[in-house]
Curated annotation (Swiss-Prot):
<protein>
    <recommendedName>
        <fullName>Peptide HSTX-X</fullName>
    </recommendedName>
</protein>
<keyword id="KW-0732">Signal</keyword>
<comment type="function">
    <text>Leech salivary gland peptide with unknown function.</text>
</comment>
<feature type="signal peptide">
    <location>
        <begin position="1"/>
        <end position="21"/>
    </location>
</feature>
<comment type="similarity">
    <text>Belongs to the annelide toxin family.</text>
</comment>
<feature type="propeptide">
    <location>
        <begin position="22"/>
        <end position="25"/>
    </location>
</feature>
<keyword id="KW-0964">Secreted</keyword>
<feature type="disulfide bond">
    <location>
        <begin position="27"/>
        <end position="42"/>
    </location>
</feature>
<keyword id="KW-1015">Disulfide bond</keyword>
<feature type="modified residue" description="Proline amide">
    <location>
        <position position="51"/>
    </location>
</feature>
<keyword id="KW-0027">Amidation</keyword>
<feature type="disulfide bond">
    <location>
        <begin position="33"/>
        <end position="47"/>
    </location>
</feature>
<dbReference type="GO" id="GO:0005576">
    <property type="term" value="C:extracellular region"/>
</dbReference>
């Protein structure tokens, strides 16, 4: 019983990590953020909305 629970927990953690990695797409260059908003800029791997 305990072993089954441990395996299930490990699989759930693995699935959560994989889903998180798919959702977080790091930008590498300035133009990677143009699809979401014209005023977005790539800063430290994330698309950040810039004022103006």
């Amino acid at each position: 019983m305990m072993r089954t629970l441990l395996v299930f927990l490990l699989l759930a953690i693995l699935a959560a990590v994989l889903i998180g990695n798919i959702q977080v797409e790091a930008c590498k260059v300035l133009t990677d953020c143009n699809h979401s908003n014209a005023h977005s800029r790539c800063i430290k791997g994330r698309c950040v909305l810039m004022p103006g």
